Design a protein with these regions (language model features):
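Transmembrane alpha-helical segments in multi-pass inner-membrane proteins
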Residues: 16, 20-22, 58-68, 189-199, ...
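Hydrophobic core segments of alpha-helical transmembrane domains in multi-pass membrane transport
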Residues: 45-50, 68-74, 101-108, 146-154, ...
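Membrane-embedded helix boundary and interhelical linker motif in transport proteins
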Residues: 7, 29-77, 81, 256
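Helix-loop-helix "hairpin" substructures at the membrane interface of multi-pass membrane proteins
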Residues: 12, 135-213, 236-242
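Residues that define the loop-to-transmembrane-helix transition and helix capping
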Residues: 2, 36, 61-62, 92-93, ...
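Transmembrane helix-bundle core of multi-pass membrane transporters
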Residues: 85-160, 187, 252, 257, ...
Length: 290
């Protein structure tokens, strides 16, 4: 039974890790925290289920692609229209703008899709496979597969591609990058759009696990932020490890103690890390040398 709980926790941790990756990217490149991440999770789940699955009767892959594309467009538009005008202001001004945009997305979802929760059975229904006596649902396998693919692909792009070099140069010094001819505003917009795509994928993968509601992404966005702090503020490998650790910790502790305290446990883990290891599991400086 405990093994089953651990697998479920790691699957949820992989979702937290995707959101945490978006937080880490935005922080490293734009020096802000995107507190709208949870609402991007929510809005993408609504668009995916209500518009593309139920409305247009698209298959899972096409619906996921279009939902992610809509989130990317929203993220890029926010960066070019709002953040580009605020980047010379104090940091908290840009951060507050993400809070406002998140509230806008949540209310927009409520207006368009209504207050009633939506149910989506997923592409595999309730199908599962037994591995060593542990039942793993096909949806959990999909979550692990998508998360691993994204993480490996992201590492290869950042490490070996010209796009990765451009993004790293922009993250290190925007002014120098601009002098070198790098279109900094376009890179920033692309970074924010990518973070929104990661949040969208998290929402799409979550949709079959829970009812789709206007509140479904709020805690996920916060826990993604917590995962990034646990892993090391701005550390990309740390964000992955922090997400998995957070999912494992909250699910296992909820099983051993009480599910009532599941969310509280996640933030208790954060407090413990802030006291014992405030720099996180993999500090950003160490991650950059990796």
């Amino acid at each position: 039974m405990l093994a089953q709980v651990i697998v479920s926790g790691l699957a949820m941790g992989a979702i937290y890790a995707l959101v945490a990756l978006g937080h880490a990217f935005v922080w490293k490149t734009m020096n802000i925290v995107n507190f709208a991440a949870g609402e991007f999770v929510t809005f993408s789940a609504f668009i995916f289920v209500a518009t593309f699955i139920n409305g247009f009767n698209l298959n899972f892959l096409l619906a996921a692609f279009f939902a992610a594309a809509v989130m990317a467009a929203l993220g890029a538009a926010f960066s070019r229209i709002v953040f580009a005008r605020l980047q010379n202001q104090r940091v908290f001004v840009a951060i507050i703008s993400t809070v406002g945009f998140g509230l806008f997305l949540k209310e927009l979802a409520r207006i368009i899709y209504g207050p009633q929760p939506l149910y989506y059975d997923g592409p595999f229904g309730q199908g599962a496979v037994s591995l060593g006596g542990v039942m793993i649902t096909y949806q959990q396998i999909l979550i692990f597969g998508v998360a691993i693919t994204i993480m490996v692909g992201q590492y290869l792009v950042l490490r070996y591609s010209m796009l990765g070099k451009v993004m790293r140069a922009t993250a290190l010094d925007r002014e120098t990058a601009a002098l070198m001819g790098i279109p900094v505003n376009a890179v920033l917009a692309g970074t924010f759009a990518y973070a929104c795509v990661l949040a969208a994928i998290a929402g799409i993968l979550m949709a079959p696990l829970f009812f789709v509601t206007t509140e479904m992404g709020t805690l996920v966005g916060l826990k993604g932020f917590v995962a990034m702090i646990i892993g090391g503020f701005g550390s990309i490998p740390g964000a992955i490890l922090g997400g998995l650790l957070l999912g494992f910790s909250e699910n296992t502790a909820a099983f051993l103690i009480s599910a009532t305290y599941k969310d509280a446990i996640a933030f208790l883990v954060l407090l413990i890390f802030l006291v014992i290891r405030p720099e996180g599991l993999i500090p950003e400086a160490n991650a950059d040398r990796a």
